[in-house]
A protein has these predicted regions:
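Substrate-binding cleft of secreted/luminal carbohydrate-active enzymes
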Residues: 29-44, 52, 60-223
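Short, solvent-exposed mixed-charge patches
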Residues: 231-232
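Alpha-helical scaffolding within the catalytic cores
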Residues: 8-23, 43-55, 76-80
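Aromatic-lined carbohydrate-recognition surfaces of secreted/lumenal glycan-active proteins
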Residues: 1-17, 60-70
Length: 232
């Protein structure tokens, strides 16, 4: 099961590296989704719920989590209980924000799987190392765990080195340096593709890595185009 947070503008599912839930659902990686929708007023929830049901809800079972920060009252809970039926969800999960700290659940985040913060995809010097680190984590936790003889460790070393190299470039103070950074990132991805072709990785693992790399390259191209538009 996978849970995501959707703030009032609902854009966080695609704005951050670790929150492209719509893509993961569309690829069949999620069987049942518990998106948690935060809003200051209960009336805002139904609009967000409709958007999720119309998009992500087509690819997996949907159990909506609805929260009004610490404004929970019996009346609000009763209103929230019917939203999933209205939006076509398969169930409901009511929660209240303060409980994560009151009962010590925040410690799970500090020391657990999600200890690495999300990174904005246009953040020079942070996004690419985060993307490549995620690739390395996928290789470690999936490919090498399930099929240790698939050869993925050979490309993993190159991906990790590329992440360190891009992290060493640091941030960018202006659009000219941002453009240079993203162009270097594009070259890095081309080099990794060539290295993957020569690494002798098992075919199905190679195909999946190429798909993940293509997704990263799409974001690089989008950022290059955005910077070039600003520089005109």
């Amino acid at each position: 099961l996978f849970s995501c947070t959707c703030f009032a503008d609902y854009n966080h599912r695609q704005m951050y590296v670790y929150q492209d839930v719509e893509k993961w659902a569309g690829e069949g990686l999620i069987d049942e989704l518990y998106p948690m929708i935060y809003a200051a007023a209960a009336e805002e929830h139904i609009e967000r719920a409709d958007e999720i049901a119309a998009g992500i809800g087509k690819s997996c079972r949907l159990v909506l989590g609805l929260g009004t920060y610490d404004g929970q009252t019996p009346e609000i809970v009763a209103e929230q209980a019917v939203y999933n039926r209205t939006a076509g969800g398969n169930g409901n999960s009511i929660f209240a924000l303060p409980y994560t700290q009151v009962f010590g659940f925040d410690g799970l985040y500090a020391e657990g799987l999600y200890r690495t913060p999300a990174v904005h995809t246009d953040d020079c010097g942070a996004a690419m190392p985060a993307f490549l680190a995620e690739l390395c984590e996928t290789i470690d936790s999936t490919y090498l765990y399930l099929c240790p003889d698939c050869g993925a460790e050979r490309i993993r070393e190159k991906i990790a080195a590329a992440a360190d190299e891009l992290a060493g470039l640091g941030g960018a103070a202006d659009d000219e340096s941002r453009l240079a950074y993203w162009q270097q990132a594009a070259q890095t991805m081309r080099s990794l593709r060539e290295a993957l072709d020569d690494a002798g990785v098992e075919a199905r693992v190679q195909a999946d890595l190429l798909d993940r790399m293509a997704y990263i390259e799409q974001i690089i191209a989008r950022n290059i185009a955005a910077v070039q538009r600003r520089l005109r």
